[in-house]
């Protein structure tokens, strides 16, 4: 069944409850193009590529480093990211050297790993990062929660297995959130041109202070809640066998929106 719905003025919470087969998995998008992904392996501890190129904070502090992109990898614990005038990286851990974070510069990209390559039995740690608004951001976590405070960036890409994503951010170009069972609750204070949200069983709530460009969502058994600004018009392309969509609260003349926001949700089956 394919269905198209249109809405108009008023503050809206569009709640999409989906039970489906995940249509897209394993894709990584960063900064609008193909990305070099340093995928870790857990078969013999946490391992990643080019391990010899990484340094500890004791050897080479990050303070004073400039980068156009920041890529954060973290396993468990918490990741806190705040807006600032300069880049800084720290962790609340002073234990075994192999379990301390590593970092390196790859051209204009700063990459942070949670430990030495090959380390095992990693403790829960808190990673704290500050970023200026010109920096593009990529975050990969396993079970670590991620908190954003006043982050300003053109592109934000977050991938998590079971960690939660919370906070506020001003994203102007691209927002991508992918989880397995982790939840996300974001207050978006700018208007990103492109938004994608994918989850297997997580709950995502995205509240926009300004109308975004396009929003595309997909899920297996998770749910989505979208908050759009007062007066925003939208067009929802809803393709499903038996999914549910609640767009109560929207009223539009003759049931038509102005296509200012395009929302797309694809499912196979649901209840």
PLM regions: where:
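Right-handed parallel beta-helix
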Residues: 138-184
